[in-house]
Swiss-Prot record:
The keyword Nuclease does not apply. This is Complement component C8 beta chain. Glycans are attached at N44, W70, W73, N101, W551, W554. It is found in: Secreted; Target cell membrane. GO terms for cellular component: extracellular region; membrane attack complex. Residues 64-117, 545-588 form the TSP type-1 domain. The gene is C8B. Disulfide bonds join C65-C100, C76-C110, C79-C116, C122-C133, C127-C146, C140-C155, C162-C200, C378-C403, C503-C550, C505-C521, C508-C523, C525-C534, C557-C590. Its main location: secreted. Belongs to the complement C6/C7/C8/C9 family.
Length: 590
């Protein structure tokens, strides 16, 4: 069961009221030649601090990384004078198993009499090192239009069009990056947002002069006059996980080989310490009688939109795409995705998100005759905030004595068994010192929240995105045989998706969350569990929640449709654990 409330005040007052209410709460802290490890050995990040014993399952046997045998060599590429072969990751290493300390691809020189026809016609100036084709009117204009300064070489005179210094849009470098949706990470640059095509009209934001890149259609600042805060109550961890956790870090439901039509929230990097801490501490209460109060505030700073066509690619990405073999070799295209991601951002919302989860002991609340409604009401009643926030007094029918009782419960939580079990914070946007102060200390003060909001203006995070597959950037304007390269990238993306999914990991114990990092799998353990498989714990008879297996391959097209399936057996639910959420099958038109 879920209950939601949403309200708006002029400043982050509503959220801070609850912060004030809880302000005294402390936050706890095969070939004989084998194909190189992509990651270091496993380091368990569990925060458990008490004495533990090994569970009945005990430590699982180490799983060694395993690659397939080598593919056949490709034909000799007539332009690169090289041939290629690769190996697939059959099984990631796990539980301190042997890593793959060897390469999963090989390239060697070769000779061929076939002609190279890789040149793309350029009617302008061909840049010396980057190979970019630019209009001759951009020569000697004071801008590095080529990316290698060759357009500014041997100039008798520089005809500079921009006579005033102008700033770059906030986060514009990140917006030019490719994106890996499996890990929620930004990779290498695929677009050149330092290319202006001679444009020099200033764009004023907050009395600052910005120069609009050629690739950008719009960059629209958002007014910070009002903030909306949403507060939602979840009666169980399964409800909380489905509605909050999966949206925070999981994109497993996307079929990444196709366009994703709508804008969606950009999750937190799955390898970040902040997310691992969040998962570990909330997962601890997956089978306790707890209620979850989740509060979330999103601050939007700017909306970004990319031009729909005729984009200037970053020269590093362009050169890599121009070098991939025309004969399909998964290893080369896989490396392209590893370095540059597999999608790029076409629209984005920039800003910051502050969210916290208050975990309450349901039985203790019932014994004391309190509800989460009481906590919310007290948070909005009779609290005076700092000078940066105007005083707000709201009477919601809760007695003063009851509010004081709630506050005393919170204040004394470390001295006796109280209602409040934990408070876990996630912050995105703002300078790093503000993120650290918010996420790893007590609840923020009004002044600190105001500082964070100011910092978000100049250091925004990407909080929502709309994306397209990377192969959509490959056009005949830049790449010879672009249709072949595009089809190869499309095919490689489907294979890449199957190779990097955490469903390939063996189950962790104690409801640990498996994550795949390169060629190994790690377990993020709930607080109270540790070990490479989360097998060391003092807790007994813990119900095990179900997790999905990997998707099957798509069926052949029949009646205009194709289907794929998965099973809830990795592991299956045990001892009263929750079943898998989401569909067991998917169907697409074909």
């Amino acid at each position: 069961m879920k209950k939601s409330w949403t309200w708006t005040w002029r400043v982050p007052a509503e959220l801070l009221l609850l912060c004030a209410a809880l302000g005294c709460l402390c936050v706890p802290g095969s070939r004989s030649e084998r194909p190189r490890s992509l990651e270091p050995t496993v380091v368990n990040r569990s925060l458990a601090k008490s004495r533990h014993s090994r569970s009945v399952d005990a430590t699982p046997m180490p799983i060694d990384c395993e690659l397939s045998s080598w593919s056949s060599w490709t034909m000799c590429d007539p332009c690169q004078k090289k041939r290629y072969r690769h190996a697939y990751l059959l099984r990631p290493s796990q539980f301190n198993g042997e890593p793959c300390n060897f390469s999963d691809k090989e390239v060697e020189d070769c000779a061929t009499s076939r002609p190279c026809r890789s040149q793309v016609r350029c009617e302008g100036f061909v840049c010396a090192q980057t190979g970019r084709c630019v209009n001759r009117r951009l020569l000697c204009n004071g801008d590095n239009d080529c990316g290698d300064q060759s357009d500014e070489a041997n100039c008798r005179k520089i005809y500079k069009k921009c006579h005033h210094e102008m700033e770059q849009y906030w986060a514009i470098g990140s917006l030019a990056s490719g994106i890996n949706l499996f890990t929620n990470s930004l990779e290498g640059p695929v677009l050149d947002h330092r290319y202006y095509a001679g444009g020099c009209n200033p764009h004023y934001i907050l009395d600052m002069r910005f120069r609009k890149p050629y690739n950008v259609e719009s960059y629209t600042p958002q007014t910070q006059g009002k903030y909306k805060f949403a507060l939602a109550e979840y009666e169980s961890y399964s409800d909380f996980e489905r509605n909050v956790m999966e949206k925070t870090y999981s994109k497993s439901t996307f079929n990444l080989g196709f366009k994703i039509p709508s804008i969606f929230e950009f999750g937190i990097n799955t390898e970040s310490d902040q997310l691992m801490n969040y998962i570990s501490r909330t997962k601890r209460f997956s089978h306790t009688k707890s209620k979850f109060l989740h509060a979330r505030s999103a601050l939007e700073v700017a909306h970004y939109k990319l031009k729909p066509r005729n984009l200037m690619l970053h020269y590093d990405f362009l050169q890599r795409v121009q070098r991939v073999p025309l004969e399909y070799s998964y290893g080369e295209y896989r490396d392209l995705f590893r370095d540059f991601g597999h999608h790029f951002i076409t629209e984005a919302v920039l800003g910051g998100i502050y969210e916290y989860t208050l975990i309450m002991n349901k039985e203790a609340m019932e014994r004391a005759d309190y509800s989460l409604n009481d906590v919310q009401a007290c948070a909005k009643n009779d609290f005076k905030l700092g000078a940066a926030i105007e005083e707000v007094y709201v009477s919601l029918g809760v007695s003063t004595s009851k509010c004081r009782g709630i506050l005393n419960e919170i204040k004394d939580r470390n001295k006796r068994d109280t209602m409040v079990q934990d408070l876990v914070v996630l912050v995105r946007g703002g300078a790093s010192e503000h993120i650290t102060a918010l996420a790893y200390s007590d609840l923020p003060t009004a002044d600190l929240m105001q500082e964070w909001g100011d910092a978000v203006q100049y250091n925004p995070a990407i909080i929502k995105i709309k994306v397209e597959p990377l192969y959509e950037l490959v056009t005949a304007t830049d790449v010879a045989y672009s249709s072949t390269v595009k089809q190869n990238m499309r095919q490689a993306l489907e294979e890449f998706q199957g190779e990097v999914s955490p469903c390939r990991c063996a189950p962790c114990q104690g409801n640990g969350v498996p994550v795949q990092k390169g060629s190994r799998c790690d377990c993020i353990c709930p607080v109270g569990f540790q070990g490479s498989a989360c097998e060391i714990t003092s807790r007994k008879n813990v119900p095990i929640d179900g997790r999905w297996s990997c998707w099957s391959r798509w069926s052949s097209c029949s009646g205009g449709q194709k289907t794929r399936r998965r099973q809830c057996n990795n592991p299956a639910p045990q001892d009263g654990g929750s079943p898998c959420s989401g569909p067991a099958s998917e169907t697409l038109a074909c």
